[in-house]
Amino acid sequence: FIEGTYGGRNHPNQEEERRRFCEEIVRVSDRGGTVLIPAFANGRTQDIVMMLHKYLPELNVHVDGMGKRIAKIYMDHPNVLKEPDLLKSSWRWSKQVSSKSDRKKALDADCIVSTSGMLDGGPSIWYLNRLKEDRRNSIFFTGYQATGSGGRSLLETGKVPIWKQKVP
């Protein structure tokens, strides 16, 4: 079997993209803002947290949503991971949101990694609704935004449905 989702395309250098991504996070943090990273629960959340731990260990990073449970499953099965120790240390380094008060504290973080990656639910909507008024804050998408998703709506119109209302 051959998977060809990204076949036939030239892609930018991954290391260069990681560097640019991290530089932008630092830029937002330096101006007093918070970066919201809506991420898919399986794989993307863990990859983002490991990257931030590796390249920006000085940041205050909070993780919320189903990606936490997926990470626990991965850590319980280190044999399926390329870098199990990096995931484990990255998870200890980041702050796991597990209560309403944790969620409120996360609003002051440098970076929040949270599900749903397409802004169709999950804690990301809660964070977006609270961070959207402060222009120092930013949202960074790291995955595909399907037609009809909240993320695609935000990219195309500058508005996203939050609790059935389109808000800028």
Tell me what each language-model feature is:
Residues 1-168:
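Acidic/His-rich, metal-assisted hydrolase cores and their charged scaffolds
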